């Protein structure tokens, strides 16, 4: 009868012998266990048979190759074979996995420790941060990082309490997909210590933002919360000013699209991160401030309720908030739409009958019109997202699509100051061009301006500096830039709308209603013919000459006259506007893949 030897595969200590002499064993069954470097290694039978000798006992030390036991080869009846353990895939999990499952339950909104607070939040009309994140991402695509972290307060609170009351240390972070594309999220959980910034949730942000930079992922930040948390005790911290989260997040500006959502109270550090975002969305009941009520009172500046500090009635007209949403449901939908503009063309699009454009600018040159109607007709139906609509209202800034292609848009608003560009409007337009250039969105400019705003009040706003930002920003941009003159194109204001010059754009075209001049016609007449007008004593005669001179300049500056002198590229049927824009954008080379590389150092927060 053949006899096989079983030898030690490694040097170690025998911690258990599982068979005895005369015992029947089957191939693959465990005979004994060796401990090597504090790890247990099973020694198994290579063939079936009967154990004929056992040469070691528990506690023995063996060298590699030492003989452990012998087995006489032979068939083992089915009923006598040592049966391997049967794995029950549907049975109860083993203890270590069960512990993980049990711990994960504390992260859910239906955890007993959270149910009451979740109900109270729902009663206020708000979703939880986890509900918002679930709504943001494609179904089942979100994977959380750092969910088992708890507040660093074990020196003052029981660990069990921290697990129940501070899940994820109040910061839900991870990666999912929006519209099929990977997106990162960092969401403060207001149900955990009022969404404050704890030691470990700072660590989680640091980790996430580093991964975001490495993978070039867009980021959505749910910023609701009260700022820094002084109650963490488990780390020796004096001021915590070495926290990297703010620097890491700011470094993403211009690298990847960043979206911030403020719902409810957003103060201090939470607000600082929000302000770093390319797009700031806030709900109607949000309050946003660099200092909350406690800081204000502590500074001896008065006592205020949270709702009195940075309400939307302040933060939207002053330009802090880009888009105001009715609630967090709409806020998440806006974030999804915003991210879609950076995901490439959409194959499905529709538009209004473009012949409507022929009738939206009145024939009478002094009659105002709603430029929003022009924008909505020109863009693909339902694709318009206007940014900062209550700030700098002399210029409309928006994102949209033309034949499915994402574009950025700036447009003078003739209903405000006749379309004149003031300081706020200039800042708003310059920042929007930066945003579009950073992420390679072509810019379409709809020009109808008498120029920049003039007068002592305008200059008191530091207009010289603000207005010049439009020139400097456009000169540094490399995205395709198309200017369409709807009516007025006068002076430096018109040049600024065209990126610095009518020949700085890829294409400058005008509708038949276009009128042009080096400055406003009325001002030009009063300046150039002042002496002649002053010499006429009869008011009617003076007015008649004035009207004649204005009419002469108007005729000279008509769109067809400008095209005749080739100061613009063409005068077109307004119904052809989309086609001409699409044609020139198609001729431009595609933007290179910039993942991991910035085109601009950052996108101005203002």
List the predicted regions and their residue ranges.
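Short hydrophobic beta/alpha edge segments that flank linear recognition/processing sites
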Residues: 23-44, 63-80
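Short histidine-centered loop motifs in beta-beta connectors
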Residues: 9, 16-24, 47-48, 52-57
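Short beta-strand-turn/beta-hairpin segments enriched in glycine/proline and small hydrophobics
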Residues: 1-14, 30-48, 249-251
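Short, compositionally biased
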Residues: 44-52, 75-92
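A contiguous, mid-protein "functional segment" used to position or interact
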Residues: 57-73, 576-586
